[in-house]
Amino acid sequence: MNAFTFPLLLAFCAFAHGAWVLDWEDEFNGGNLADRWNFELGCNGWGNNELQCYTDNRGANARQEDGKLVISAVREWWGDGVNPDKEFTSARMTTKANWLHGKFEMRARLPKGKHLWPAFWMMPQNSEYGGWPRSGEIDITEYRGQRPQQILGTLHFGAAPDNKGDVGTGERDFPIDFSADFHTFGLDWSPDSMQWLLDDQVYHTESLQRNFWDGVYNQNGSPFDKNFFIILNLAVGGNFFGGEPFDPSESDGWAKNTFEVEYVKKWTWN
């Protein structure tokens, strides 16, 4: 724990002379999920050759249960009438609200099993710098289900393929099985920096006081100077697994096919 002391001081200094004020939360205690969240739908692979279809507010894939959001990856054939049918279903949810800067936190227990890919991340509300990744992407927490002690967070920017940039935590191992219990995963986003947190401890910082794409972004910190919304999803397979083979029948060996979220919260520094 002592290794986190200095980053915590940096976190305090980045937002000195004020206090965090909670201004958005979902504790998943009831009500219609669609009041606060959009459901993104389809079987198009989502730019990553993913193996699931995302469905629309369907209890088998996204439900509130015992004060939690439960997103489940289910092996079943599904289609959207446009793309080839897929052998898995799941859910991908985005907040109706969007923000520039603040503290973002999720308390969750992650799935466990080959090629399960939960994510807590953010995309720009308006792609003011152009299509992905020009307008940025903020990955707060991603995870591979066959590596239950490893998480990562990333900023994506620039232009694919030649000028695409990625900075962030890299693949970070912890003495924790993230599928065994609930943990908090967070991001402190100020005009000057992004700080990734695990259980309230800062474990990585990236400065925003730089030009991420010289000659295209017009000021330091761009494209992370616009409003972003939150995404929660659970994918199956795809490019994230680096070409590692996966047969759908291997899902029979999944130890835990659910991404359980106790809450998502957002604070502003005032």
UniProtKB/Swiss-Prot annotation:
Reaction(s) this enzyme catalyzes, per UniProt: Hydrolysis of (1->3)-beta-D-glucosidic linkages in (1->3)-beta-D-glucans
Subcellular location: Secreted
KW Metal-binding (keyword) present: no
Active site: 137, 142
Cross-referenced InterPro entries: ConA-like_dom_sf, GH16, Glycosyl_Hydrlase_16
GO cellular component, one term: extracellular region
One GO term of the biological process aspect: carbohydrate metabolic process
Keyword set, alphabetical order: Glycosidase, Hydrolase, Secreted, Signal
Boundaries of every GH16 domain copy: 22-270
Temperature dependence: Optimum temperature is 50 degrees Celsius. Retains 20% of the maximal activity after incubation at 60 degrees Celsius for 30 minutes. Retains approximately 15% of the maximal activity at the temperature below 15 degrees Celsius.
The EC number(s) this enzyme carries: 3.2.1.39
Description of pH dependence: Optimum pH is 6.0. More than 80% of its maximal activity is maintained at pH 5.5-6.5.
Domain of life: Eukaryota
Documented activity regulation: Ca(2+) does not affect the enzyme activity nor the thermostability. Other cations, such as Mg(2+), Mn(2+), Cu(2+), Zn(2+), Ag(+) or Hg(2+) do not cause any serious adverse effect on the activity. Also no significant change in the activity in response to the addition of 1 mM EDTA.
Signal peptide extent: 1-18
Pfam family for this entry, one: Glyco_hydro_16
Annotated PROSITE patterns: GH16_2
Single GO MF annotation: glucan endo-1,3-beta-D-glucosidase activity
Function of the molecule: Hydrolyzes laminarin majorily to glucose (G1), laminaribiose (L2), laminaritriose (L3), laminaritetraose (L4) and laminaripentaose (L5). Hydrolyzes laminarioligosaccharides L3, L4, L5 and laminarihexaose (L6) to G1, L2 and L3. Hardly hydrolyzes L2. Does not hydrolyze lichenan, pustulan, carboxymethyl cellulose, locust bean gum or soluble starch.
Family assignment from sequence similarity: Belongs to the glycosyl hydrolase 16 family.
Annotated protein name in UniProt: Glucan endo-1,3-beta-glucosidase
Species of the source: Cryptopygus antarcticus (Antarctic springtail)
